[in-house]
């Protein structure tokens, strides 16, 4: 591999590494979306929540101002985090919580785990490619990185549908939401992994002969 291609491969791997770090941060954190109810009276207790792939954290905050939503009140108040429990306001949402939302959470988490697995396998191939005459390992590595990006964006879409289902359900108190920084990390990780994988594949492909006789000359030189 030429010096120019080697430099391009290393720069691409750096961006892929950044995408892998962002994917890991998104998977292990609980700030994919923030949910909040609409308050009819300013002195009510706000039950806000933020959640990720594995658990939801609900916060009870007493509202003493005229604002009828509890955006930005997540850090304060009494917080309760539980795994695969997307609603804690009361018993009426228990069935919905343990069936529909748990299925969404498990599906999104499983797909995200596949994404991390592809990242690990791709990194192993990329590391081994730095050995003597092992540039061909960059090609499967690039495919694994692209697959990791695709799995990550599928997980993002599953979570987006989960949030939409929460908001539309009559069994929950959530009517307002916004996507938080973990969601942004997942989207950025998808972009870096998928595009990085495609560029890595292009850079690792052998140079096509510009003239018909170049391939013949290469064959004769090998003998």
UniProtKB/Swiss-Prot annotation:
GO molecular function, one term: voltage-gated calcium channel activity
Extracellular side: 30-109, 157-180
Cytoplasmic compartment residues: 1-10, 131-135, 206-223
Domain of life: Eukaryota
UniProt PTM comment: N-glycosylated.
Regions that span the bilayer: 11-29, 110-130, 136-156, 181-205
Pfam families hit by this protein: Claudin_2
BP-aspect Gene Ontology terms: calcium ion transmembrane transport; establishment of localization in cell; regulation of calcium ion transmembrane transport via high voltage-gated calcium channel; sarcoplasmic reticulum calcium ion transport
Main location: membrane
Residues modified by glycosylation: 43, 80
Gene Ontology cellular component list: L-type voltage-gated calcium channel complex; plasma membrane; sarcolemma; T-tubule
Keywords assigned: Calcium, Calcium channel, Calcium transport, Cell membrane, Disulfide bond, Glycoprotein, Ion channel, Ion transport, Membrane, Transmembrane, Transmembrane helix, Transport, Voltage-gated channel
Subcellular location: Cell membrane, Sarcolemma
Membrane topology qualifier: Multi-pass membrane protein
Stored InterPro entries: PMP22/EMP/MP20/Claudin, VDCC_g1su, VDCC_gsu
Expressing tissues: Skeletal muscle.
Family: Belongs to the PMP-22/EMP/MP20 family. CACNG subfamily.
Binding partners and assembly: Component of a calcium channel complex consisting of a pore-forming alpha subunit (CACNA1S) and the ancillary subunits CACNB1 or CACNB2, CACNG1 and CACNA2D1. The channel complex contains alpha, beta, gamma and delta subunits in a 1:1:1:1 ratio, i.e. it contains either CACNB1 or CACNB2.
Function: Regulatory subunit of the voltage-gated calcium channel that gives rise to L-type calcium currents in skeletal muscle. Regulates channel inactivation kinetics.
Protein name: Voltage-dependent calcium channel gamma-1 subunit
Native organism: Rattus norvegicus (Rat)
């Amino acid at each position: 591999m030429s010096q120019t291609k080697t430099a391009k491969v290393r720069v691409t791997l750096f961006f892929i590494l950044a995408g892998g770090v962002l994917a890991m941060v998104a998977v292990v954190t609980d700030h994919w979306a923030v949910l909040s109810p609409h308050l009819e009276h300013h002195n009510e207790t706000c039950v806000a929540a933020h959640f990720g792939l594995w658990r939801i954290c609900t916060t009870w905050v007493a509202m003493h101002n005229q604002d009828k939503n509890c955006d930005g009140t997540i850090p304060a108040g009494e917080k309760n985090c539980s795994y695969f429990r997307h609603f804690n306001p009361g018993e009426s949402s228990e069935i919905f919580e343990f069936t529909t939302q748990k299925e969404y959470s498990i599906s999104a988490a499983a797909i995200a785990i596949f994404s991390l697995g592809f990242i690990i396998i791709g990194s192993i191939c990329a590391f081994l490619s730095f050995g003597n005459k092992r540039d061909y390992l960059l090609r499967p590595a690039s495919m694994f990185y692209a697959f990791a990006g695709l799995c990550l964006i599928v997980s993002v879409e599953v979570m987006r549908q989960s949030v939409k289902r929460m908001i539309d359900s009559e069994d929950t108190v959530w009517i307002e939401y916004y996507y938080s920084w973990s969601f942004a990390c997942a989207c950025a990780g998808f972009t870096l992994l998928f595009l990085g994988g495609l560029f890595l594949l292009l850079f690792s492909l052998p140079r096509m002969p510009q003239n018909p006789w170049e391939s013949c000359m290469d064959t004769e030189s090998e003998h």
